[in-house]
């Protein structure tokens, strides 16, 4: 077997025909500037080739369903093992996917409850019992000695209906008596009951008087009767004492001896909220339901209906629905111009929920010979009809703005039906376990066997061992604060990646090549060592681990480092170093200079004092926040710190930002609960600069996103040649007909379908990839066509447009954020998260600001090298120097040490977090005894 993996002649994206060697069974780190080609080498070359080779083993028919598997542009790769990629971008958005289902811990818990759980009645709380037919006969003969009894089979339990067919069916089977709602009656032809009432119905199978001694004949008769009753009653029978009329239930299934309710035999799917057997029938296992929010339907009750108080209807229009409401209002001596707050509640209820009586619409309005009478279903039903209709996606989207998600009133958010929630082990049902933090669950699992019977222990031992193993893997990757019922869609990229990492460690595979994309994202320095230990564990099992990473601890812990550079984009794509970390420290690459201390991000000599104004957020209680009161001083660089799960994102992204977005932009996103906010008028806008893509189609690019492309097109329109030809700005767009190449639709390439082979993209033979037709390309500025301009890097464009004041600032802003290497027309789908974020920052930088803007950034250092961080922080410092406020959620100490003000959350993650531990200057926070950030900060500030 090869002792190394070798890549020869890699040319994907900006890679310059590079060769690299990776030792087998090693922890290898790929590092380098953002845009240098690390991901191109790791994911687009090594992973893509590994996946392609695996899929080539499938039949041509199977390959047809697996989509595009192009061969990467590489000469050859030797020694390649099966490859598993663990990226950040593949978060599961399905609301039914949770931490428990992803890690399979919940599946093992379902098995544990199905095999070792004890059932209790949801009606009486009694422990459920289960008997064999022989045991039932013994109990009846012992309990009812010398008594006259009826043996009945329950048919209907508390349900509505006339049951005519059921009675006829029983009569034909030869039964003579039936018990309806406690009264025994003779079965007659055509018998029925009130269909609108709930009924309890039992058929009388037999009646007998038991002797006071053991009678073999009587026992045989009773046994046959019990067997018949069990069959007729679906495993449940009822014994009625003739003297006292007291009823007692017996069942072959789990049964409540008091009320007679019976459960099916437990199976794992009864405890699954994704199965009809276990899901809460009201919310279908989601734990939440959509309700129409009246505050969104009528946000301002001081307005009247004519002016548009009912938002779904808008202002008055000459339409039937307004005529109906007018007729309703007339009954209560009101008009369309009466303020909503002055309309009687009974009238508003009819407007919202409908009226039973027919409303009279004047014949003049409907142009008929007589008055028109019509019923009115109400605004709520109107909205529900649109919501539940499959006809119009746009209509559904419109109705969504009036919807609020509320906890299901039936299961109280626990997702399961009441039967599933009635099974317990050590006084806990399965939903209570799913609601625990992983660290709490570990404690429960470690002690649960002490509280089991011998039989339960024998059944549970292996299951508990598997659960414990998986919990330990999650703890190792620093996810102790998550609960099993946490939705996968709410996890950050780093969290979902570490969950998949824990799952992979649990799978115990060997001889596999794992490729991870920055697993340290969102991880506090405290948890970094646990993550590195997990990766080494994966390596020691006999696997090769490649990590694309910028974290200093990870680099120093690696067995092998590959440094890609020297710069980014066209100036990157080369191997500037490959070897052991100790050897790298002796080199002079950009990465080595930061590792050996030749270069560093300097700590400021003095910190800003701000402008004296602030925003105060009081009483935040979303997720795990414990009534947090926090002050954000304006005109400063504020950094929010704390371990993973301590409440940073809840405080900023889920509370502060939605409040401000609602205030400034009427955003529909609702903030998490809080009491009040003060000082909102001290800023004039809020800008959230995240790492989501700037566009999801190949037609989107940095030039279109920043708006500079409109200015460039206008420049070309004003050229003499364009004026002579009468060209308008649309002529220079590749998205509309006129100037674009129609052969390829302005894409610059054509997609050739190859049926059983992957689709092939070839440059358009008419425009040769330039996107425009010949006539458009004949218009030139300084000898360059519009296609040539799009093909320029930002650095080239800055020189080219240096004398064009309306274009230069927008391009210069891209250069200032360190994106000089990307092309103006580069497809946004090829940009990394860090690059997308900096394009957004550049767009904001190029705008004129009032110096009263609040910028919010969540972990902006994701995907950034030390040098990229230095450039990014220079840009953010400039924004603050202009009077703006920059608020960053961050774990990176190079950013934290530059803060003017730190807000530290903690002390732990999940339930043990959610408190404000410290706020103030970095030097002050570094002395806090409770904070996990403090010791690391103190070390770097020395």
Stretches with model-predicted labels:
Residues 1-942:
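Conserved phosphate-binding elements of NTP-dependent enzyme cores
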């Amino acid at each position: 077997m090869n002792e190394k993996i070798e890549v020869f002649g890699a040319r994907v994206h900006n890679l310059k025909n590079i060769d690299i060697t990776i030792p087998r069974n090693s922890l290898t780190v790929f590092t380098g500037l953002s845009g240098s080609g690390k991901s191109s080498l790791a994911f687009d070359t090594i992973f893509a080739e590994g996946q392609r080779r695996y899929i080539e083993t499938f039949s041509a028919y199977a390959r047809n369903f697996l989509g595009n598997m192009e061969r990467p542009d590489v000469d050859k790769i030797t020694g390649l093992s099966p490859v598993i990629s663990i990226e950040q971008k593949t978060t599961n958005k399905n609301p039914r996917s949770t931490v428990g289902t992803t890690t399979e811990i919940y599946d093992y818990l379902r098995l544990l409850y199905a095999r070792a759980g004890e059932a209790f009645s949801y009606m009486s709380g009694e422990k459920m019992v289960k008997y064999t037919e022989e045991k039932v006969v013994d109990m009846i003969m012992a309990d009812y000695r010398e008594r006259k009894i009826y043996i009945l089979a329950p048919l209907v339990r508390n349900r509505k209906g006339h049951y005519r067919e059921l009675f006829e069916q029983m009569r034909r089977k030869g039964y003579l008596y039936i018990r309806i709602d406690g009264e025994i009656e003779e079965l007659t032809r055509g018998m029925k009951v009130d269909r609108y009432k709930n009924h309890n119905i039992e058929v009388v199978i037999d009646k007998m008087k038991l002797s006071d001694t053991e009678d073999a004949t009587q026992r045989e008769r009773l046994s046959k009767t019990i067997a018949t009753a069990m069959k007729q009653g679906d495993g449940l029978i009822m014994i009625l004492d003739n003297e006292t009329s007291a009823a007692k239930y017996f069942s072959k299934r789990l049964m409540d001896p008091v009320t007679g309710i019976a459960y099916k035999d437990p199976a794992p799917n009864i405890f699954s909220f994704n199965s009809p057997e276990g899901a809460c029938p009201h919310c279908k296992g989601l734990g939440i339901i959509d309700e129409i929010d009246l505050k969104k339907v009528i946000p301002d009750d001081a307005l009247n209906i004519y002016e548009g108080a009912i938002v779904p209807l808008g202002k008055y229009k000459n339409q039937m629905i307004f005529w109906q409401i007018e007729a309703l209002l007339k009954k209560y001596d009101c008009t369309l111009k009466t303020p909503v707050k002055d309309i009687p509640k009974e009238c508003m209820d009819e407007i919202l929920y409908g009226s039973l009586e027919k409303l009279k619409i004047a014949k003049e309005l409907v142009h008929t010979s007589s008055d028109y009478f019509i019923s009115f279903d109400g605004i709520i039903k109107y909205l529900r009809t649109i919501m539940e209709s499959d006809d119009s996606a746009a209509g559904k989207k419109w109705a969504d703005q009036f919807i609020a998600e509320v906890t299901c009133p039936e299961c109280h958010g626990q997702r399961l039906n009441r039967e599933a929630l009635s099974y317990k082990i050590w006084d806990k049902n399965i939903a209570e376990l799913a609601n625990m933090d992983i660290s709490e669950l570990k404690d429960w699992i470690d002690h649960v066997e002490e509280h089991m019977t011998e039989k339960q222990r024998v059944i549970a031992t292996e299951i508990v061992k598997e659960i414990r193993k998986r919990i330990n893997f999650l703890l190792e990757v620093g996810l102790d604060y998550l609960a099993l019922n946490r939705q996968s869609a709410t996890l950050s990229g780093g969290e979902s990646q570490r969950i998949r990492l824990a799952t992979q460690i649990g799978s115990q595979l060997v001889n596999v090549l794992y490729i991870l994309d920055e697993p340290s994202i969102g991880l506090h320095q405290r948890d970094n060592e646990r993550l590195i230990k997990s990766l080494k564990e994966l390596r020691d099992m006999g696997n090769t681990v490649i990590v694309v990473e910028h974290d200093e601890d990870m680099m120093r812990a690696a067995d092998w480092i590959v440094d890609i550079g020297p710069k980014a984009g066209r100036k990157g794509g080369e191997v500037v170093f490959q070897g052991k970390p100790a050897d790298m420290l002796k080199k002079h690459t950009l990465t080595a200079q930061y590792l050996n201390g030749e270069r560093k991000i300097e700590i400021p000599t003095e910190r800003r004092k701000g402008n004296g104004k602030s925003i105060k957020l009081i009483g935040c209680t979303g997720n795990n926040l414990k009534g947090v009161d926090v002050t954000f001083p304006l005109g400063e660089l504020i950094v929010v710190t704390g371990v993973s799960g301590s409440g940073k994102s809840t405080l900023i992204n889920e509370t502060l930002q939605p409040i401000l977005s609602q205030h400034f932009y009427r955003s529909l996103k609702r903030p998490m609960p809080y009491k009040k906010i003060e000082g909102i008028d001290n800023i004039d806008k809020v800008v959230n600069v995240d790492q989501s893509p700037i566009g999801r189609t190949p037609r989107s690019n940095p030039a279109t996103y920043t708006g500079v492309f409109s200015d460039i097109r206008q420049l070309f329109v004003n050229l003499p040649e364009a004026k002579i030809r009468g060209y308008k700005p649309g002529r220079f767009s590749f998205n509309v007909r006129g100037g674009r190449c129609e052969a390829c639709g302005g894409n610059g390439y054509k997609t050739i379908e190859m049926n059983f082979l992957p689709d092939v993209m070839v440059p358009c033979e008419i425009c040769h990839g330039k996107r425009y037709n010949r006539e458009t390309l004949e218009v030139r500025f300084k000898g360059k066509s519009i296609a040539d301009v799009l093909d320029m890097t930002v650095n080239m464009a800055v020189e080219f447009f240096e004398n064009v004041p309306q274009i230069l600032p927008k391009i210069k802003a891209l250069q200032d954020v360190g994106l000089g290497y990307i092309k103006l027309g580069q497809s946004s789908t090829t940009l990394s998260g860090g690059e997308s974020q900096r394009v957004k920052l550049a767009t904001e930088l190029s705008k004129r600001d009032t110096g009263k803007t609040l910028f919010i950034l969540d972990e902006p250092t994701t995907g950034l090298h030390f040098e990229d961080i230095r450039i990014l922080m220079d840009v953010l410092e400039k924004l603050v120097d202009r009077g703006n406020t920059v608020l960053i959620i961050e774990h990176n100490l190079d950013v934290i040490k530059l803060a003017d003000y730190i807000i530290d959350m903690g002390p732990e993650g999940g339930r043990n977090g959610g408190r404000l531990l410290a706020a103030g200057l970095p030097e002050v926070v570094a002395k806090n005894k409770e904070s996990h950030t403090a010791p690391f900060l103190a070390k770097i500030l020395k």
